[in-house]
């Protein structure tokens, strides 16, 4: 038994290194070790859908890991949780987790619990919801780093900040729904996540769910494919707080707009708090149903604009302090003066400064700052000038030519590092140059999943901030795509 647990731990450790944090949480957080023999390890999945998806996505890789670790004779078997025996169902249903653990240790109770019931108790510790109190609704996408305390307030975002804090303190009261809108990288996600984290702190019994509009869409599509729409509706219509990021990603998506409309109504009628973010005012949304737009404007709409000079200086100072670097006043002011786009670009400039200091062991001067600023401005101009006339084939053509690859390489399943890296870059460029969803990008790159594509995009985005070579390569490829 213990050896089986150890082997399962080895498998989890290996897979965790290969997946993003969100992807690992989605598929492996709710799997539990049940039993083991010399030939097999039994793992419990929360439901048949989850079981089938894990088998489909990861069985091959798990077998490879077992072989690598010298356990090639062992098979991992995924099973659904055992059903409660009818004779004990009511007893378990009305018992809290604390009471169950007491019963399990009690001598008089132990004599009447058969083996099957003990197994139920073991599983119950993991996923039975107590009916007498609310259970904390675990949310893998709420990041603890986003708080009101570390949000830098200025004239451009003060109203949005105050409204967000008020919502967290008194959800469902004053500003419901609330829509925070503004350009990219101005702090909308920071505020939305801060609302979730502060509400979770102040209202521990609340069921809170933060989700991007794209993940909301993908989950809805998946629920249709697997005939799990009832589960989807139940999940989203029985919340105390729903936070949806980047609602503009649902433009031109009529089916999900219809579903969101009904979800909105269900939550609104129960005075449950909803907060959305968007890159524009509701009235400017294209191919968005009027009745859904009217729902957004029913509550508070508040904008975040670009930071002024003083706020840009404060943002740079804070980021430099977090990264442990000292930025001379003249350099700090130069960056704040030149980079006027958004918070994300300001923080990227500081990250690039740190990379020069750490990797080249040099002191920062104005020439280095000018180079960094030119890179950032060039990248922003590329994004601004990009339109849908740049098609998929032109992007692929540049990737294949410049990285010396074939169609088979870019659309296949080769694990060679240089080819894997190229696929990451291809996904990243498709995301930046087109309006394709991650599911659509996945189909182009050899049938990859949404999670795999999202991992690729996030990986390159992160590496651009920390690896000058990768950043320069991406800029070069973008320039060639624009000229192609």
Swiss-Prot record:
Keywords: ATP-binding, Cytoplasm, DNA replication, DNA-binding, Lipid-binding, Nucleotide-binding. ATP binds at residues 185, 187-189. GO terms for molecular function: ATP binding; ATP hydrolysis activity; DNA replication origin binding; lipid binding. Domain I is involved in oligomerization and binding regulators, domain II is flexibile and of varying length in different bacteria, domain III forms the AAA+ region, while domain IV binds dsDNA. It comes from the Bacteria. Residues 141-357 are annotated as: Domain III, AAA+ region. It comes from Borrelia turicatae (strain 91E135). The lineage of its organism: Bacteria, Pseudomonadati, Spirochaetota, Spirochaetia, Spirochaetales. InterPro entries: AAA+_ATPase, Chromosome_initiator_DnaA, Chromosome_initiator_DnaA-like, Chromosome_initiator_DnaA_CS, DnaA_C, DnaA_dom, DnaA_N_dom, DnaA_N_sf. Coiled coil: none annotated. This is Chromosomal replication initiator protein DnaA. It holds the Pfam family Bac_DnaA_C. Oligomerizes as a right-handed, spiral filament on DNA at oriC. GO terms for cellular component: cytoplasm; plasma membrane. HAMAP family: DnaA_bact. Plays an essential role in the initiation and regulation of chromosomal replication. ATP-DnaA binds to the origin of replication (oriC) to initiate formation of the DNA replication initiation complex once per cell cycle. Binds the DnaA box (a 9 base pair repeat at the origin) and separates the double-stranded (ds)DNA. Forms a right-handed helical filament on oriC DNA; dsDNA binds to the exterior of the filament while single-stranded (ss)DNA is stabiized in the filament's interior. Signal peptide: none annotated. One of its GO terms (biological process) is regulation of DNA replication. It is found in: Cytoplasm. Residues 1-73 are annotated as: Domain I, interacts with DnaA modulators. Residues 358-484 are annotated as: Domain IV, binds dsDNA. Belongs to the DnaA family. The keyword Nucleotide-binding applies.
């Amino acid at each position: 038994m213990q050896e089986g647990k150890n082997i399962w731990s080895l498998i989890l450790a290996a897979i965790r290194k290969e997946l993003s944090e969100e992807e690992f949480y989605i598929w492996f957080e709710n799997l539990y070790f049940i039993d083991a023999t010399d030939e097999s390890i039994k793992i419990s999945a929360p439901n048949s859908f989850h079981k089938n998806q894990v088998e489909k996505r990861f069985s091959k890789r798990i077998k490879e890991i077992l072989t690598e670790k010298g356990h090639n004779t062992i098979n991992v078997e995924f099973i659904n949780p055992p059903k409660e025996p009818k004779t004990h169902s009511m007893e378990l249903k009305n018992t809290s987790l604390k009471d169950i653990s007491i019963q399990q240790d009690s001598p008089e109770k132990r004599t009447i619990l058969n083996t099957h019931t003990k197994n139920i108790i073991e599983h119950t510790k993991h996923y039975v919801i107590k009916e007498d109190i609310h259970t904390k609704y675990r949310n893998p996408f709420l990041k603890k780093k986003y708080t009101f305390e570390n949000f830098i307030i200025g004239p451009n975002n003060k109203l949005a900040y105050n409204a967000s804090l008020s919502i967290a303190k008194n959800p469902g009261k004053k500003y419901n729904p609330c829509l925070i809108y503004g350009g990219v990288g101005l702090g909308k996600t920071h505020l939305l996540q801060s609302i979730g984290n502060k509400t979770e702190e102040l209202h521990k019994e609340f069921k809170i769910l933060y989700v991007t509009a794209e993940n909301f869409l993908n989950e809805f599509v998946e629920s249709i494919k697997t005939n799990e729409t009832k589960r989807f509706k139940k999940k989203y219509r029985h919340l105390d707080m729903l936070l949806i990021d980047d609602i503009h990603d649902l433009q031109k998506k009529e089916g999900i707009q219809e579903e969101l409309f009904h979800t909105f109504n269900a939550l609104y009628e129960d005075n449950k708090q909803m907060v959305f973010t968007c890159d524009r005012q509701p009235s400017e949304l294209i191919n968005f149903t009027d009745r859904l737009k009217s729902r957004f404007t029913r509550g508070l709409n508040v904008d975040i604009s670009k930071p002024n000079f003083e706020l840009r200086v404060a943002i740079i100072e804070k980021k430099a302090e977090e990264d442990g670097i000292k930025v001379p006043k003249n350099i700090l002011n130069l960056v704040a003066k030149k980079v006027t786009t958004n918070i994300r670009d300001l923080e990227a400039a500081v990250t690039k400064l740190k990379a020069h200091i750490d990797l080249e062991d040099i002191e920062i001067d104005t020439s280095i700052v000018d180079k960094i600023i030119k890179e950032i401005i060039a990248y922003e101009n590329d994004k601004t000038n990009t339109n849908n006339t740049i098609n998929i084939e032109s992007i692929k053509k540049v990737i294949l030519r410049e990285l010396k690859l074939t169609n088979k390489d870019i659309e296949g399943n080769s694990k060679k590092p240089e080819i894997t890296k190229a696929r990451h870059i291809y996904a990243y460029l498709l995301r930046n140059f087109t309006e394709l969803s991650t599911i659509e990008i996945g189909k182009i790159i050899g049938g990859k999943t949404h999670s795999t594509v999202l991992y690729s995009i996030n990986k390159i985005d992160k590496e651009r901030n920390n690896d000058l070579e990768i950043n320069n390569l991406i800029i070069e490829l973008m320039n060639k795509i624009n000229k192609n």
